[in-house]
Amino acid sequence: MSSHPDTPSQCVLIVDDDVSVTDTFSRMLRLEGYEVWAALSADEGLSLAQTHQPHAIILDLRMPLTSGLQFLRAIRAIPLLTNTPVAIVTGDYYLDEAHAAEIQALGAQLRYKPLWLEELVGLARDLLGGDPVD
């Protein structure tokens, strides 16, 4: 947990259609001192991202209506969010090479579920370049 209570925490946006994933990831990151916003759809996530301009985004690849890859393309087209660090998290171990290559070309990390506490916190630190404070 952060030892700087007066320093604003870094904001992470979690986008996943599985409420148990968003709840678990949110709780785990909040315990580490991050501010967390959560969305249950890509459309809701895009709205939150534009409103709150998170420091990093962790999102699911497979979501109904708008996929994580479509979300990533949209984020990269928004000037204020173009350089936001993004990680796509998926349980799809047989991801097609073209999709994996596009994710990499769009500057996002690709990780596989399940993510345990240490892995999730490590991912957040990696995306944000360090501790959960500015």
What is the meaning of each model-derived region?
Residues 1-11, 116-134:
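Non-catalytic signal-transmission and effector/linker regions of two-component phosphorelay proteins
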Residues 8-20, 25-29, 57:
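Conserved acidic segment of CheY-like receiver
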Residues 19-37, 105-108:
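Two-component/phosphorelay signaling modules centered on CheY-like receiver
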Residues 38-47, 68:
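Helix N-cap/capping motif at the beta->alpha junctions
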Residues 60:
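Active-site residues of response regulator receiver
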Residues 63:
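Receiver (REC) domain active-site loop signature in two-component systems and cognate sites
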Residues 70, 93-112, 118, 122:
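Alpha4 helix (beta4-alpha4-beta5 surface) of REC/receiver domains from two-component response regulators
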Residues 89-91:
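Hydrophobic/aromatic residues positioned on beta-strands within the core alpha/beta folds
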